[in-house]
């Protein structure tokens, strides 16, 4: 019988991303929040905003998963910022 070790999400990172306005930070947070994580047992992300700053907290099982997940989220944030620039 093989015993499965529980994976702990002990690799963490917090990003603080400033926006020009509180409204932009709130919009970015709301746009990203519904996105499902494919393997929540390996990688988790929480979004919040305080004034004009979007806070993103990442947790993962290892540094590789953290790097890949963070890279993907940053690409999404970049797209959101570009859309805000075009629409404003």
UniProtKB/Swiss-Prot annotation:
InterPro entries (UniProt xref): CTAG/Pcc1 (IPR015419)
MF terms (GO), sorted A to Z: chromatin DNA binding
Compartment list: Nucleus; Chromosome, Telomere
GO BP: cellular response to pheromone; maintenance of translational fidelity; positive regulation of transcription by RNA polymerase II; telomere maintenance; telomere maintenance via recombination; tRNA threonylcarbamoyladenosine metabolic process; tRNA threonylcarbamoyladenosine modification
Pfam (any one): Pcc1
Function recorded in the entry: Component of the EKC/KEOPS complex that is required for the formation of a threonylcarbamoyl group on adenosine at position 37 (t(6)A37) in tRNAs that read codons beginning with adenine. The complex is probably involved in the transfer of the threonylcarbamoyl moiety of threonylcarbamoyl-AMP (TC-AMP) to the N6 group of A37. PCC1 functions as a dimerization module for the complex. The EKC/KEOPS complex also promotes both telomere uncapping and telomere elongation. The complex is required for efficient recruitment of transcriptional coactivators.
Record-linked PANTHER family: EKC/KEOPS COMPLEX SUBUNIT PCC1 FAMILY MEMBER (PTHR31283), EKC_KEOPS COMPLEX SUBUNIT LAGE3 (PTHR31283:SF5)
Name of protein: EKC/KEOPS complex subunit PCC1
Organism of origin: Saccharomyces cerevisiae (strain ATCC 204508 / S288c) (Baker's yeast)
Organism lineage string: Eukaryota, Fungi, Dikarya, Ascomycota, Saccharomycotina
């Amino acid at each position: 019988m093989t015993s499965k070790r529980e994976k702990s999400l002990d690799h963490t990172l917090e990003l603080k991303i400033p926006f020009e306005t509180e409204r932009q930070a709130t919009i970015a947070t709301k746009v990203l929040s519904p996105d499902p994580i494919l393997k929540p047992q390996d990688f988790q992300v929480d979004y919040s905003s305080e004034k004009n700053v979007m806070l993103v907290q990442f947790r993962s099982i290892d540094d590789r998963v953290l790097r890949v997940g963070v890279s993907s989220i940053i690409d999404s944030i970049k797209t959101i910022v570009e859309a805000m620039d075009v629409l404003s």
